Design a protein with these regions (language model features):
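Short S/T/G/P-rich N-terminal loop/turn motif that feeds into the first structured element of a domain
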Residues: 1-56, 60-74, 81-101
């Protein structure tokens, strides 16, 4: 079962997100599944919206969420992100090939 994660909270900023990515991957951006120290993340997107910075993830299974949480550890708290993301099972999902321009 696919698991969705949405993280859009007052303490999540682009700068804090970027620092989490640097600490988690050693890189400035996540561009490939091989950049991550865990398996099972199918979709990752992050960007600035009208209500603040937002991160959206789709995991293949609950076990992948646990691998994600274990890899993150306390990094979010260390950079000042106070609220956790929301996780819930997907009711419906579809995908199309993504072309990068």
């Amino acid at each position: 079962m696919l698991i969705l994660a949405i993280h859009q909270t007052p303490s999540l900023t682009q700068e804090r997100y970027d620092e989490v990515v640097r600490r988690l991957t050693g890189k400035s951006r996540i561009e490939s599944p091989s950049d991550l120290p865990f398996e099972g993340l199918l979709v990752h997107a992050a960007g600035q919206g009208p209500s603040g910075f937002c991160v959206f993830d789709v995991f293949e299974l609950e076990e992948a969420v646990e691998r994600f949480r274990n890899a993150l550890g306390t990094i979010p708290e260390e950079v000042g992100i106070e609220e956790p993301p929301q996780f819930f099972p997907a009711h419906a999902a579809m995908s199309v090939p993504i072309e990068r321009g």
